[in-house]
């Protein structure tokens, strides 16, 4: 009996169809060295840069160094269970984090794993942590203000939605306080917030979470935490994970704010990883691509045009300086990447001027076009007045006789400095800021004792809320200083001043 080749093929095909054996095909390698959170593997020929790989014990790693004969992998979990000779396999994907409104009110690590004990997160989608920043044609100029609720910032260093504004200063000068106040002030503003804690003490982070819950700000906030006891890999990934979560809102046509606290520790974590991976060190032992580390992160903040949904992602990176040195490597890098900086001066802080913003060294390069017209008209001369006051103050120390104009300028500067002081966790709506600054810039406080200024401010706001609520409402809605609004403000300030003086 002759069997044709086609019949043999048919029989083989039928047998194969009946077979239920599945072949699990994957590319794998072997660990040749492990230690200090770094594993070196041989045999992963097709692995991609930044690809997620899985170890035999279930832990994941990130392929960062692709060398001729081995791959340098940073371990994302506990590396002590991984040993030489273990199998490591490719996953074919890059790190993704959950994104969406399910993350609001939650505390997660940079891999999106919940840390708050409130159960699993049912995210609507996952986004890659590293993604290309929006191109030029997708963007539009910054034109909408992001109110921080801090008088000194909203008046003189305004921030717009889609801007990158650096907060820089020595340790314990109030950098995080400004960021937290900004989050609290976004209530009912339609801005979703992501706070990224990099290398912070757990106790400090717990205090921040308590404050945000107490003020009701956790409803629209996600916290991404890589604390001081987490591996350097998680500290390195944290800001990118935070940016990915914020981009979800931006690409959905909404507004988001992301705070990176702080990028000095992020750069230190990256330096640690790079040195362990034997990458050549450069200035201050940082690797050569440390500028790109932060530029690719901060370029993801943008204001999209209407064709792409019109959403925005605003970034407030924080940098900690050492002994007031803003010309160090990392501070100068980030200053050159961002659209301005808020410089906090330790001398002002210890003198009791809080927030301790040094107006002369702080600038917002694009926020001016986003500032509302009413604030522009009221605070236009404020920055110059304060800068001149600081200059005159230095000269006045060496001079005994001052002319009347100089004396008047010194008095005005002193009153304005006092007026710009603000308690922590008490952000102020923009219409109330305008009312207070109107009194200061128009000279109504010049002859009041300096220690009574805060009391006057309190009384003015109380009266405005009770008797002149229509004026505040008009400022809030029209966003401009019309003759009618100015007349209302003038009457309110004069009434309060008269009652206060008497």
Swiss-Prot record:
SUPFAM superfamilies: C-terminal domain of alpha and beta subunits of F1 ATP synthase, N-terminal domain of alpha and beta subunits of F1 ATP synthase, P-loop containing nucleoside triphosphate hydrolases. InterPro entries: ATP_synth_asu-like_sf, ATP_synth_asu_C, ATP_synth_asu_C_sf, ATP_synth_F1_a_nt-bd_dom, ATP_synth_F1_asu, ATPase_a/bsu_AS, ATPase_F1/V1/A1_a/bsu_N, ATPase_F1/V1/A1_a/bsu_N_sf. Its EC number is 7.1.2.2. It is a peripheral membrane protein. It comes from the Bacteria. It catalyses: ATP + H2O + 4 H(+)(in) = ADP + phosphate + 5 H(+)(out). Signal peptide: none annotated. It is found in: Cell inner membrane. Transmembrane segments: none annotated. One of its GO terms (cellular component) is proton-transporting ATP synthase complex. Produces ATP from ADP in the presence of a proton gradient across the membrane. The alpha chain is a regulatory subunit. F-type ATPases have 2 components, CF(1) - the catalytic core - and CF(0) - the membrane proton channel. CF(1) has five subunits: alpha(3), beta(3), gamma(1), delta(1), epsilon(1). CF(0) has three main subunits: a(1), b(2) and c(9-12). The alpha and beta chains form an alternating ring which encloses part of the gamma chain. CF(1) is attached to CF(0) by a central stalk formed by the gamma and epsilon chains, while a peripheral stalk is formed by the delta and b chains. This is ATP synthase subunit alpha. It comes from Kosmotoga olearia (strain ATCC BAA-1733 / DSM 21960 / TBF 19.5.1). The lineage of its organism: Bacteria, Thermotogati, Thermotogota, Thermotogae, Kosmotogales. The gene is atpA.
């Amino acid at each position: 009996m002759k069997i044709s080749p086609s019949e043999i093929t048919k029989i083989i095909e039928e047998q194969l169809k009946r077979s239920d054996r599945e072949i699990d095909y994957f590319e794998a390698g072997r660990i040749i060295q492990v230690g200090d959170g770094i594993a070196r593997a041989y045999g992963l020929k097709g692995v991609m840069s930044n690809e997620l790989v899985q170890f035999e014990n279930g832990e994941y790693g990130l392929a960062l160094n692709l060398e001729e004969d081995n791959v340098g992998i940073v371990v994302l979990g506990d590396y002590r269970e991984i040993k030489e000779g273990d199998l490591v396999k490719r996953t074919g994907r890059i790190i993704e984090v959950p994104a969406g409104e399910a993350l609001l009110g939650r505390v997660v690590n940079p891999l999106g794993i919940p840390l708050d004990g409130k159960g699993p997160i049912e995210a609507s989608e996952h986004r890659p942590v590293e993604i290309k920043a929006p191109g030029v044609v997708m963007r539009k100029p910054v034109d909408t203000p992001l109110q921080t609720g801090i008088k000194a910032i909203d008046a003189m260093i305004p921030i717009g939605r889609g801007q990158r504004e650096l907060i820089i200063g020595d340790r314990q000068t109030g950098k995080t306080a400004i960021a937290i106040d900004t989050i609290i002030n976004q209530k009912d503003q339609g801005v979703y917030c992501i706070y990224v804690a990099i290398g912070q003490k757990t106790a400090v982070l717990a205090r921040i979470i308590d404050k945000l819950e107490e003020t009701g700000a956790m409803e629209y906030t996600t916290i991404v935490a890589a604390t001081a006891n987490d591996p350097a890999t998680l500290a390195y990934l944290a800001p990118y994970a935070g940016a990915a979560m914020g981009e979800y809102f931006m690409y959905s046509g909404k507004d988001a704010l992301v705070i990176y606290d702080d990028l000095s520790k992020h750069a230190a974590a990256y330096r640690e990883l790079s040195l362990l991976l034997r990458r050549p060190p450069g200035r201050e032992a940082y690797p050569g691509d440390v500028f790109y580390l932060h530029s690719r992160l901060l370029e993801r903040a943008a204001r999209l045009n209407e064709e792409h949904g019109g959403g925005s992602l605003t970034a407030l990176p924080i940098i900690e300086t050492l002994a007031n040195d803003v010309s160090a490597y990392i501070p100068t890098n980030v200053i050159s990447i961002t659209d301005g900086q808020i410089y906090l001066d330790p001398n002002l802080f210890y003198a009791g001027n809080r927030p301790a913003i040094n107006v002369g060294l702080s600038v917002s390069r694009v926020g001016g076009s986003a500032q509302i017209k009413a604030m522009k008209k009221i605070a236009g001369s404020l920055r110059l007045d304060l800068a001149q006051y600081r200059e005159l103050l230095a000269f006045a120390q060496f001079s005994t006789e001052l002319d009347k104009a100089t004396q008047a300028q010194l008095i005005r500067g002193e009153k304005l400095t006092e007026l710009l002081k603000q308690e922590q966790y008490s952000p102020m709506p923009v219409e109330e800021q305008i009312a207070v600054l109107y009194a200061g810039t128009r000279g109504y406080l010049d002859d009041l004792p300096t220690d009574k200024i805060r009391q006057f401010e309190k009384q003015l706001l109380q009266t405005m809320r009770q008797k002149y609520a229509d004026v505040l409402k008009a400022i809030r809605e029209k966003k401009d200083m019309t003759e009618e609004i100015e007349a209302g403000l003038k009457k309110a300030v004069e009434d309060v001043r008269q009652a206060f003086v008497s």
